Amino acid sequence: MWGLVRLLLAWLGGWGCMGRLAAPARAWAGSREHPGPALLRTRRSWVWNQFFVIEEYAGPEPVLIGKLHSDVDRGEGRTKYLLTGEGAGTVFVIDEATGNIHVTKSLDREEKAQYVLLAQAVDRASNRPLEPPSEFIIKVQDINDNPPIFPLGPYHATVPEMSNVGTSVIQVTAHDADDPSYGNSAKLVYTVLDGLPFFSVDPQTGVVRTAIPNMDRETQEEFLVVIQAKDMGGHMGGLSGSTTVTVTLSDVNDNPPKFPQSLYQFSVVETAGPGTLVGRLRAQDPDLGDNALMAYSILDGEGSEAFSISTDLQGRDGLLTVRKPLDFESQRSYSFRVEATNTLIDPAYLRRGPFKDVASVRVAVQDAPEPPAFTQAAYHLTVPENKAPGTLVGQISAADLDSPASPIRYSILPHSDPERCFSIQPEEGTIHTAAPLDREARAWHNLTVLATELGWSWGPERGWVPLLVAEWSAPAAPPQRSPVGSAVGIPQDSSAQASRVQVAIQTLDENDNAPQLAEPYDTFVCDSAAPGQLIQVIRALDRDEVGNSSHVSFQGPLGPDANFTVQDNRDGSASLLLPSRPAPPRHAPYLVPIELWDWGQPALSSTATVTVSVCRCQPDGSVASCWPEAHLSAAGLSTGALLAIITCVGALLALVVLFVALRRQKQEALMVLEEEDVRENIITYDDEGGGEEDTEAFDITALQNPDGAAPPAPGPPARRDVLPRARVSRQPRPPGPADVAQLLALRLREADEDPGVPPYDSVQVYGYEGRGSSCGSLSSLGSGSEAGGAPGPAEPLDDWGPLFRTLAELYGAKEPPAP
């Protein structure tokens, strides 16, 4: 069993055992010299558990760090020591005979702080273990070889300006890779190298704080602070590292707005409309963002009514605009004060206020050529209806504020009076009727009157220049700009020299319409009605205005023989009643005359008629039949019978018309009408002929009736040369001249059915074939001989085939019979 492990110390005790660890001895068998049962006793095993090696040590040869020895080793050289585990054989080696352990290279604790190995003693000859393996640790002892570092640096921090002393800015943290449990190699102390006196740092925690109060961002916005961390507790010989902290002062609203000048002067033309921008005002505020937002307002003075001020979208500028129309002649300048105020105020900095400023504003109104100004914004005139043309309606008036002596011309825009019902006097502005007015047709007329300034105009040089005035007429379109000194009908700048006004003319009502029935009345009464029964309520209307003689009175037939009576209800209606005795039976309806009149001065009246039929009624009061229908029934024909008779007659007529149309269509398909046979032919040739002989047309009637045809006239026979356009079927040659009519009728029907053949009544133009053709010319001009018109030979036509042989026999020259 192991007896004792001796630890050899090297120079000054730098190497050594950390301590002893006792363990119970194990039973071991007897030796070869003492056979027999083993004697059990308590033995000492390993008495160590760890070694230490200083890091970063590099010597000229492997360094001895310890010695292993077992009590079974008698010094006879039979014991061999083995070392296994982390770094065994490479970092750590052992002498097999002596048990000395050496380290072969420099170690770094930051890479590996300790090594775990196994030691074992075996028999050199048989490698039989003499002892079980035992584990031990070799620790690398730390030295101060790593400076502090800031893994998160450089740092950026923000702190509000004007912060109090000691306000925390940021915490910096350094890291030292040395062993914090051994010595002071990892004990750090923080200091400020650069950034004093504005900032300080806590030596132990690394918290950066403000060192002075009231740091102003507007003076210095950014600071660069250098922080150092030193190990060994900050003592001499320690290693150090540093980092930078960029501290930015954030803005707070600690500065009030300030106008750069105390007086602002602007000018605006008097014609500027509401909303026109006059100018911009800006109060300076060195703060940023929302802390520099401002609101502007007009404090006092005469400008609050004429002008308004608002803040632009960026919240910096004040926009001064026109609030109401300006008038140079009324007021030429305005003076008032404008205040600028911060919208967001921090109560913590109220002591640095007030956060507002005031400036004076003066606005000068510039004169400009103005259009004529009407005395009223709108005019309301009245005129009675039915007045003669030329009746005075009213007068409108406008004045030139720039030059009261300048004349004004008035006109009515045509689109506002399309019917030309009114006219206006150009110089005076009086409006007259141009046609009779009817209130019932149109009660209101809305005119647009144009007032134009003449005599002077605002020229391009912004000066007053004279204009030559020509005869005035209302323009239908906006006038064009005329050169200075030219004769014009309206001013040079119509937009600045003319103005418009609305004139509403009301047509007053007169009693010019007689009352009328509201609708045509056609009613009935039962023949069994009792006397005094109400037949119909009659209503009337008067187109005149309500209240102007529009009340209507009624009066019916008078006298004891009246079949009906009319009772006036005094509310614009009347009741049609039966008289005291029943109405006598009657086949025709009754026409009841009713007189209507109004209460005007003078009163107007009219007569209307109400149709009343006497009918037979059912017991429930419904109509069974009226006397006119009963009269028809007495003749033996009812309404249903009449309708049946009319239907039958119409059906018969339709059948007859259809039969005639079908028969006529069949006849037209079988025969050729005579008027269709009469055709004229216009034949045009390229060369001049011999006169009228060449233009004689053939008689189609003679061709259809060869037996009754007149003998041909002396001279060359006329020919109608038409090239066939459609290919026809071969037909057998007719047996004789008697069948010519049938042949021509067949050819005519084929030509009519062929869509490619032109109509007969057409102009045919033929070319000249020339002498190179074997058949010669097909033109009729060459049909006769030049000598005396003798007929030409028919042999060429015979050569063309059977279709042309028939023509050759008809029109070819025949040999006279032999004597």
UniProtKB/Swiss-Prot annotation:
Annotated membrane topology: Single-pass type I membrane protein
Transmembrane segments: 642-662
Cadherin domain segment(s): 46-150, 151-259, 260-374, 375-517, 517-630
Topological domains, Cytoplasmic: 663-819
Domain of life where this protein originates: Eukaryota
Claim: Zinc-finger is one of the keywords in the record: no
Glycosylation sites: 446, 548, 563
Positions of the pro-segment in this chain: 21-44
Chain positions covered by the region annotation Disordered: 768-800
GO biological process terms on file: adherens junction organization; calcium-dependent cell-cell adhesion via plasma membrane cell adhesion molecules; cell migration; cell morphogenesis; cell-cell adhesion; cell-cell adhesion mediated by cadherin; cell-cell junction assembly; homophilic cell adhesion via plasma membrane adhesion molecules
Secretion signal span: 1-19
Family annotation (PROSITE patterns): CADHERIN_1, CADHERIN_2
Assigned GO CC terms: adherens junction; catenin complex; cell-cell junction; plasma membrane
Entry annotated with the keyword Calcium: yes
Record topological domains on the Extracellular side: 45-641
Gene3D superfamilies, per the entry: Cadherins, TCF3-CBD (Catenin binding domain)
Subcellular location: Cell membrane
Cited function: Cadherins are calcium-dependent cell adhesion proteins. They preferentially interact with themselves in a homophilic manner in connecting cells; cadherins may thus contribute to the sorting of heterogeneous cell types. Cadherin-24 mediate strong cell-cell adhesion.
Domain notes: Three calcium ions are usually bound at the interface of each cadherin domain and rigidify the connections, imparting a strong curvature to the full-length ectodomain.
Entry protein name: Cadherin-24
Organism encoding this protein: Homo sapiens
Taxonomic placement: Eukaryota, Metazoa, Chordata, Craniata, Vertebrata
